[in-house]
UniProtKB/Swiss-Prot annotation:
PANTHER family: ANTITERMINATION NUSB DOMAIN-CONTAINING PROTEIN, N UTILIZATION SUBSTANCE PROTEIN B-RELATED. This is Transcription antitermination protein NusB. Involved in transcription antitermination. Required for transcription of ribosomal RNA (rRNA) genes. Binds specifically to the boxA antiterminator sequence of the ribosomal RNA (rrn) operons. One of its GO terms (biological process) is DNA-templated transcription termination. GO terms for cellular component: cytosol. It comes from the Bacteria. The keyword Transcription applies. NCBIfam families: nusB (TIGR01951). HAMAP family: NusB. The gene is nusB. Keywords: RNA-binding, Transcription, Transcription antitermination, Transcription regulation.
Length: 145
């Protein structure tokens, strides 16, 4: 199945954030490496830049929003799970036009692609809790329907 430009952007953002979390490389350095990555030409570059730079810029605030939904400190999560949760939290708070279920489904797919064997289940559980806090009207409408 062909990946959408938005999915490709999220995958590249995950790779870039993984690199940033491990090396604390400068965003410009990560951008340069991503431009040479497989699939960059098919990505929604605006979305990629928005997510990657938004998460890096707001990392501390996003981590603070995620933490109450975790069963351990965020720095004890694998870098992949942390990157995926940061991306999804950024989208839940800033990409209001994207339905929360789409954001969660995309995050689960990213965790399946890049994470450990059961990491996607953890990501799904955390984001279900987080969506109720960050998108209360939307989640209530869906659950009440």
């Amino acid at each position: 199945m062909k990946k959408s430009a938005r999915r490709q952007s999220r995958e590249l953002a995950t790779q870039g954030l993984y690199q940033w979390l491990l090396s604390n490389a400068a965003p410009g350095e990560i951008d340069a490496q991503l431009r040479g990555a497989l699939g960059y030409d098919k990505a929604d570059k605006t979305l990629l830049d928005t997510i990657l730079h938004g998460v890096i810029r707001e990392h501390a605030t996003l981590a603070e929003a995620i933490s109450p939904s975790l069963d351990r400190p965020i720095d004890q999560l694998s870098p992949v799970e942390r990157a995926v949760l940061l991306i999804a939290t950024y989208e839940l708070t800033h990409q209001i036009e994207t339905p929360y279920r789409v954001i969660i489904n995309e995050a689960v797919e990213l965790a399946k692609t890049f994470g450990g064997s059961d990491g996607y289940k953890y990501v799904n559980g955390v984001l279900d809790k987080l969506a109720v806090k960050l998108r209360p009207a939307e989640t209530q409408a869906r659950r009440g329907a």
